[in-house]
């Protein structure tokens, strides 16, 4: 993948995008030089799928934006090859291919909202029944489509990037093939698959936040997640608290200096060995809270707890641990 980025002279600079083993991006110029952030000099970046931007992991500066490739992924050198390789009508995502088409509404009303007469109601009921039969043939398909619809609902409610949802759908498919879904609710299994997918793609969401948007309980989702880990033999990277910082800062509209300070606090905490076994979202919220205080932004712990999807108690406890262990002199409000 390649794109262009403005330079100090105003001319576009062609960059090649590479990804390392940890999932971070590095940018290389057409001359083979490593591109560095013009603000802080860092050479590692992350991709924001929601905005189509490449962002510096240290200062939060956007170094590239509007990365949207509308061309085909294949190359053709003759008109015959182009005709053979061109295709139309293929699904854009797994969600669309899994029968997420329009359905006849369960409300017996017309387009203007008026109740249908009895004759039309009976006709709609009959059509609805035939549509269900035509779309779904087996219990496997019914279960899978129900999960796809639940994942699409979670994506819309939580603002989860679509690639995470597609990965979650693939995880659910594997669970369904191994009959892990039997005896468990579709909502809990779909939520667990989405939680796993977000972590796999280094865009983690707190479990407590996810549970708020599903009918399943936290205990049920956590149990299904452990089952998926054990039975599918999936390697899920340990959540880095740093990955939560940009989302918290974006919700609270914090400055790049606050983000940079929060990352430095977490890096020191890792070296001190106080991050192991702690909720990464809570650690990130506490680090951003401390960084905000150091930069004169006196918001409440509740603001940071809500943005991170954790409780105030968690933020307070992690804040005390970080400040005490790292000997940070936090200004009193």
Curated annotation (Swiss-Prot):
Give the source species: Pyrobaculum islandicum (strain DSM 4184 / JCM 9189 / GEO3)
Family (UniProt): Belongs to the TFIIB family.
Residues at which Zn(2+) binds? 37, 40, 56, 59
Keywords carried by this UniProt record: Metal-binding, Repeat, Transcription, Transcription regulation, Zinc, Zinc-finger
Recorded GO CC terms: transcription preinitiation complex
Gene3D superfamilies reported in the protein's UniProt record: 1.10.472.170, Cyclin-like
Q: Which domain of life is it from?
A: Archaea
Query: What this chain does, per the record?
Result: Stabilizes TBP binding to an archaeal box-A promoter. Also responsible for recruiting RNA polymerase II to the pre-initiation complex (DNA-TBP-TFIIB).
SUPFAM superfamilies, alphabetically?
Answer: Cyclin-like, Zinc beta-ribbon
- Could you cite one Gene Ontology molecular function of this protein? DNA-binding transcription factor activity
Q: Which SMART domains match?
A: CYCLIN
**Which NCBIfam families does the record associate with it?**
PRK00423.1
One of the protein's GO biological processes = transcription preinitiation complex assembly
Task: Report the leader peptide range.
Answer: none
- State the sequence repeat positions: 149-232, 243-324
Return the protein name.
Answer: Transcription initiation factor IIB
> Which sequence ranges does the entry mark as zinc finger (TFIIB-type)?
33-64
């Amino acid at each position: 993948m390649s794109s262009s980025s403005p330079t100090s002279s105003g001319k576009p600079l062609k960059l090649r995008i590479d990804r390392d083993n940890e999932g971070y991006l590095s940018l290389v110029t057409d001359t083979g030089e490593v591109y560095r952030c013009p603000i802080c000099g860092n050479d590692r970046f992350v991709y924001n799928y929601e905005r189509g931007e490449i962002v510096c992991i240290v200062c939060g500066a956007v170094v590239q934006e509007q990365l949207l490739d509308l061309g085909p992924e294949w190359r053709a050198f003759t008109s015959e090859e182009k005709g053979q390789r061109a295709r139309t009508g293929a699904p854009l995502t797994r969600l669309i291919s899994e029968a997420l088409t329009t359905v006849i509404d369960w409300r017996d009303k017309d387009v203007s909202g008026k109740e249908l007469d009895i004759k039309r109601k009976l006709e709609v009921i009959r059509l609805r029944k035939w549509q269900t039969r035509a779309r779904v043939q087996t219990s496997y398909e019914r279960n899978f489509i129900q999960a796809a619809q639940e994942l699409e609902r979670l994506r819309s409610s939580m603002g989860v990037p679509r690639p995470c949802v597609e990965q979650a759908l693939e995880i659910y498919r594997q669970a369904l093939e191994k009959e892990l879904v039997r005896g468990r609710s579709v909502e809990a299994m779909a939520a667990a698959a989405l939680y796993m997918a977000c972590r796999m793609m280094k865009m983690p969401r707190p479990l407590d936040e996810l549970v708020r948007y599903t009918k399943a309980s936290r205990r049920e989702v956590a149990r299904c997640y452990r089952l998926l880990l054990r039975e599918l033999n999936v390697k899920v990277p340990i959540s880095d608290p740093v990955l939560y910082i940009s989302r918290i800062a974006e919700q609270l509209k914090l400055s790049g200096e606050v983000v940079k300070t929060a990352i430095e606090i977490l890096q020191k905490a890792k070296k001190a060995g106080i991050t192991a076994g702690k909720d990464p979202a809570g650690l990130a919220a506490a680090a951003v809270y401390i960084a905000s205080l150091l930069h004169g932004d006196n918001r409440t712990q509740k603001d940071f707890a809500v943005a991170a999807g954790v409780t105030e108690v968690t933020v307070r406890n992690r804040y005390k641990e970080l400040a005490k262990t790292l000997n940070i002199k936090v200004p009193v409000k």
